[in-house]
Structure formats: structure tokens, C-alpha cells
Amino acid sequence: MNNYIFIISAPSGAGKSSLLKAFLATDIGKDNYAVAISHTTREPRVGEINSREYYFVTVAEFEQLLSQDGFIEYAKVFKNYYGTSKAELDRLLALGKNIILEIDWQGAQQTRAIYGDRAKSIFILPPSLDELRKRLEKRNTDSKETIDYRMEQVQSEISHADEYDYLLVNDDFSQSLEQLCKYFEQNIQS
């Protein structure tokens, strides 16, 4: 099987994680895909478990892996490091799965530079900035200051959307999930 790497990026609150979770519960998703678990230096949110959502590490641990060229991509986002390790990608490729990377635009650029056409990319957009703010407030995981900071960064993130192979506006969740499933199906058959 020729494995692909699918890069999924979106501003915080656009619905990326919810769409991926729903996709991975579908027949095509659970049988053919695996999400690479990223390393991060941020604190776990309530309910997050180490090695399920992220590998939670200290700044020193992250920087040590970085100095050993242990990441295929990394970035500092919202004052925290995030990165996908080479070991994680090797682990998933050995399972014969297509890999999904939930990463930002900086990581997407780095990954495409390494994997070229083998890396497909999707950018998920919110229907509007007002809706995005409502979603961030509704999930009740960030302070007002953090939400304000995230909203300040949105324009910069969205300015890179044209670098992606496919743009998906997540307005209606069911329709967005259907479009995402079609995109994945078409791209493993091509």
C-alpha cells in the first residue's frame, strides 16, 4: 500500500478535531487512517491523556528532541512548542496506515517540503469570524485573554489557506464531514 500523509490545519475553534474524530469513526476512517500524535509543551486540558491527544513534554525534553533532529515539523504556537516526531511517523507507516497530521500552516510547509506529492493538505475554515469566537467561548477551555489572542492570530493563519490542496468551510457539521470523507476517499484511490 502506498501510504499518504494528510495534513489538516485550521484556526482554533474551526472544528478540526471534531471532524477528525467523526471521520475516524467511519468505516473508511477507522480501517485506513491513523492520526499522528504530536508532542507539545502546553499543559493538558481537562480530560486529555498523555499519548492519546498529545505527548505532553517539558520545554527541555522538546528542545532535546529538536537538537537531535527528532521532528519532521515543529512550531512555537501560542507560547508553546508543538511538533511531530520522526519516530511517530515511522510507527504509523509501519502499520500500513495513511497518516493524518493535525498541524498548523508552518508545520504543513515543513512536511510538504519533505514529502512532496505524498503529502495532501486540507485547510478547515470557520463560516465567519463571529462564529469562530462563539465556538471558542462555548468550549469553555480558554480564558478571555487567550481567546482574544487566538482571534488576533486567525487572519495570519487564514492567509496561508491558499497553500492547501483543499479548503473546507465547516458551517454545517454533517455536510462538512461528508465532504471530508469524499476528499479522503478520492485521494487514496488516485
From Swiss-Prot:
EC class: transferase
Cellular localization per UniProt: Cytoplasm
Keywords, sorted A to Z: ATP-binding, Cytoplasm, Kinase, Nucleotide-binding, Transferase
The reaction(s) this protein catalyses: GMP + ATP = GDP + ADP
Residues annotated as binding ATP: A10, P11, S12, G13, A14, G15, K16, S17
N-terminal signal peptide: none
Primary location group: cytoplasm
EC numbers on record: 2.7.4.8
One MF annotation (Gene Ontology) recorded for this entry: ATP binding
Function (record text): Essential for recycling GMP and indirectly, cGMP.
Protein name: Guanylate kinase
Organism the protein comes from: Francisella tularensis subsp. holarctica (strain LVS)
